[in-house]
């Protein structure tokens, strides 16, 4: 092996969901929204001055940060915006998980967590779920270098009640606790209210699922101003202009159209509940989904044996 080859950082990469080029398929593999984004996005596109594209975008994403903060009743300095929640989470791992102690996250969860930990050389321990696929809060009461978990979890779609989320935070006030809420709009109560109660909490959300804008790559998180400043310092050390002008403009329109947002989320929740009822009638079993997908199995799967080659 050549010397330069020995110095290559090698990781097992995350495998993104397939994005087929054909249009005549029912695509379910990445939990995208079946409804288009608010029509106000098209209006924003028509208003856009193409000459503006010759200029760099606002590095601080000021207008979008303000729109998000106003919508959720937070201060601007409590909001960080990134290129999708994956970018936000990655920045969080790099910024806050620098201890020799392992970070903790569920063993059945978002598979990107272990990829980031390996990439940034962060030690970690995966905590098992219980027999019903629930996160066990007590497993996170031990010494660690940080905690991250989705709520609702993926791929189980199970929501953990806010009092249990707070129990985990109470037992980990010396480290940063990240609550990944990519699917929170489809069920359950956000941990956002805990941001003003605990200085070590970050709540991460995304435009990709409930706001129908996976193609725009907009993610954000809430935290105390000191955490948000640290995230911005790290972001600006990578690239000052991460969010493009189009995403900023479309994101603002999406946040401001509350009526359309709630209408689409309501349709998806209704469809999910109908699907759960029909799947039960067909003999499927599944945890009680609070996301926009269902983690289902069927007893007949246990009876099938693949033929010998």
Regions found by a protein language model. Give the residues of each.
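Conserved core of the PLP fold type I
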Residues: 53-172, 183-198, 202
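Hydrophobic residues in beta-strands of the RecA-like P-loop NTPase core, especially within AAA+ ATPase
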Residues: 179-180
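Helix N-cap motif at beta-to-alpha junctions
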Residues: 299-301
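N-terminal "arm"/small-domain region of PLP-dependent enzymes with the aminotransferase-like
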Residues: 1-55, 143
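Conserved small/polar residues in nucleotide/adenosyl-binding loops
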Residues: 304-309
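Short hydrophobic/aromatic beta-strand micro-patches
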Residues: 222, 295-297
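PLP-dependent aminotransferase class I/II
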Residues: 60, 200-280, 284-287
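Short Gly/Ser/Thr- and Asp/Glu-enriched loop/turn motifs at secondary-structure junctions
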Residues: 287-293
């Amino acid at each position: 092996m050549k010397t330069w080859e020995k110095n290559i950082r090698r990781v097992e990469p995350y495998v993104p969901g397939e994005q087929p080029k054909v249009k005549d398929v029912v695509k379910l593999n990445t939990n995208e929204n079946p409804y288009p984004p608010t029509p106000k996005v098209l209006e924003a596109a028509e208003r856009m001055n193409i000459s503006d594209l010759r200029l760099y975008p606002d590095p601080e994403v000021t207008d979008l940060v303000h729109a998000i903060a106003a919508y959720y009743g937070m201060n601007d300095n409590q909001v960080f915006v990134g290129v999708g929640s994956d970018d936000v989470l990655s920045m969080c791992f790099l910024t806050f998980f620098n201890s020799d102690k392992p970070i903790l996250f569920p063993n059945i969860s978002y598979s990107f967590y272990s990829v980031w930990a390996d990439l940034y050389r962060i030690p970690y321990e995966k905590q098992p779920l219980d027999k019903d696929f629930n996160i066990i809060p007590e497993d996170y009461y031990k010494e660690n270098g940080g905690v991250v978990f989705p709520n609702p979890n993926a791929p189980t779609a199970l929501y953990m009640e806010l009092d249990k989320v707070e129990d985990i935070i109470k037992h980990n006030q010396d480290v940063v606790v990240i609550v990944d809420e990519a699917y929170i709009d489809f069920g359950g109560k956000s941990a956002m209210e805990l941001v003003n109660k605990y200085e070590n909490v970050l709540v991460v959300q995304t435009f990709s699922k409930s706001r129908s804008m996976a193609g725009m790559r907009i993610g954000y998180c809430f935290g105390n101003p000191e955490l948000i400043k640290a995230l911005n310092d790290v972001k600006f050390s990578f690239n000052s202009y991460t969010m493009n002008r189009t995403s900023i403009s479309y994101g603002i329109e999406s946040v401001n159209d509350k009526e359309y947002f709630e209408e689409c989320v309501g349709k998806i929740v209704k469809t999910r509940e109908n699907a759960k009822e029909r799947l039960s009638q067909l003999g499927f079993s599944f945890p009680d989904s609070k996301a926009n997908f269902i983690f289902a199995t069927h007893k007949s799967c246990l009876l099938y044996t693949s033929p010998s080659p």
